[in-house]
Amino acid sequence: MAVGLINGRLAADEEARAEVDVLNSRLEKTSQLTKKIQACLARLDATGKSVRDVAGPLSGETRKLQVLGNNIDAVIAAIEKLRSPADSKNDEEQIIRMGPEKAGLPNYLASIKRLNKALNDMKASNLRSTQQTVADLQRLVKTGNSQLESSFDKLLRSETPRAIEPLHYLTKNMPFPVLSQEKITRLGLMNSYLTGVHQQNTGAGSSQESPVIKIYAEVRAQYLLSTLGNLATASTNTAKKKTPEAVYKAGTNGMGTYAQAMEGLFLAEYDNICSIFMREDWGPVFQATCQPALVELGRTLRELNSHIKSHITTDCYLAYEIVEIISSLSSNLENRTGELKSSLAAALKPIRETAKSSLVDLLEETKRQVNSLQTLPADGAPTPLATQTMQRLQSMVNFLRPISSIMISIGDGGWKSAAASKGGATDTIPSLVSFDVGADGQEIFAHYCADTIETLLSSLDARARVLYQQKKAVIGVFLANNVTVIERMINESGLVTLLQSRLQVLDVWRKKATALYTETCKEISIHLFDTVHTNRTARPGSGQGMVSSASIMKGLSSKDKEKIKGMFTAFNSGFEDMVARHKQFTMEKEVRQMLAQDVQHMLEPLYNRFWDRYHEIDKGKGKYVKYDKGSIAAVFRSLY
């Protein structure tokens, strides 16, 4: 049993030794393999180093070759690019020679844009070999631009009539015609391109006008000028009157229609311009297009101004009307377009200055006409000058709006100075900014009317004192008649609302007239102031009532009685003469009543007192005492 165990242990040891031997054998092989690998790695490292030493320079050269290759490719591409315009030049030239009408505007514009791009690219390359191609392209572009301008001109002219009849549109309240939308689109495309070319050639900030603007302004300006020509002529012709003395009536001149047509045409033209041109060009194009028509307007206004100045007393109202018409036209156009205000102001200036100076001229003319009177009505009738002057003021009320603006511009009382007639104003249409905003034009005009009336009456008074040779009664009647005519014409017209608070000027002159007329009454009344001293014993005591005429007569001496008789006789003579002259005078109804009342109030109480005291002087025979209280009252009533 022990031998068996030993044998088993020996066998296991032998087996373990065998495994160890195997492992040692494998370890030795592994060690040998490792040494071989290390030797291979050493050789590989040496080989890699040699490769690196050789491959490094080759890599740098390769990169250089790659860059060179890329550059060559770029040059080839550039050459191809430069060759492309030259190759396509014939195709583009064919389109250009066809023109925008045949080739079609979009196709034509695309072609000319391609030519421009090719030309710019070639100029940028600056290659000597492309100089001929550059010259050819420049020629084509120039031809294309020229044809495009010609096409713009041709299309615009084909759509622009020589003239239209403006009254057709005004009477039917129709808008003035504009260019068709299809034509506007084509014109806009051409303008957009040609304007860009012009800015490129001259610089964006250049003040030089684009050829397209010149073409448009030339074509459309002639259309506007021709359309408005007949209305301009009509405005001057309607100013001519068959009767030189006839006063101008509002609306009878053609200027209103002329301005209305001008406004409609100009606004329609502005719509065209806004649809075709770029915004920054709207103002310049509009100004250039309208300028010839505005020049003609200025010429027309100067001609009318000459006519007005030659007939200032009858046609000054035309100046006022034109001021309002052109001011309204300017305001409407400025509100819509922001343009033409200064041009219209310059055209209006002569008329406006004449309108301002007319205020002074009319006052001076009033004085001149009065001073030129060689005779006045012997019966004291009112002078036609009073009626004419008031008719002038009444007519002015019909033009109150323009007159109010003129009044504000010259200031209250400005018509009293020569400066108003010289007109040193600038070429501007006044606005509220240029005025005293607190000024009331109507109030200033009312002041002017009052000054006119005062000037008229003062001049008539001075002239009457000369021509009537200080005959106060007829002077009084004359002044009173004229005052009444003036007052009546104020109350029966639009002047009443303006002058209601200023009628005191007439009251002053009415009192002057009454005072002059009643001077005769004062002379007559002297004969009714007795200074006879009666006997004290004949005087009634206090509270005894009035002493009878018979009692007074008893107390008079013969000398006093003769004196009383003479006073009655003198009164009768003066009174009858005054009554006769009163009835011979030509008086307005109001004047006759006023003066009759003043005479009665002045003389009747004095006569009644005198009659009460002394009517018994002729015992009722009527030799000296021709009028009793009743009969003289009847005479006074007959004066009314």
From Swiss-Prot:
Entry GO CC: cellular bud neck; exocyst
Organism annotation: Neurospora crassa (strain ATCC 24698 / 74-OR23-1A / CBS 708.71 / DSM 1257 / FGSC 987)
Keyword Signal: no
Family named by the database record: Belongs to the EXO70 family.
Sample GO molecular function, one term: phosphatidylinositol-4,5-bisphosphate binding
Record has Protein transport as a keyword: yes
UniProt gene name: exo70
InterPro entries: Cullin_repeat-like_dom_sf, Exo70, Exo70_C
Name of this protein: Exocyst complex protein exo70
Domain of life, source organism: Eukaryota
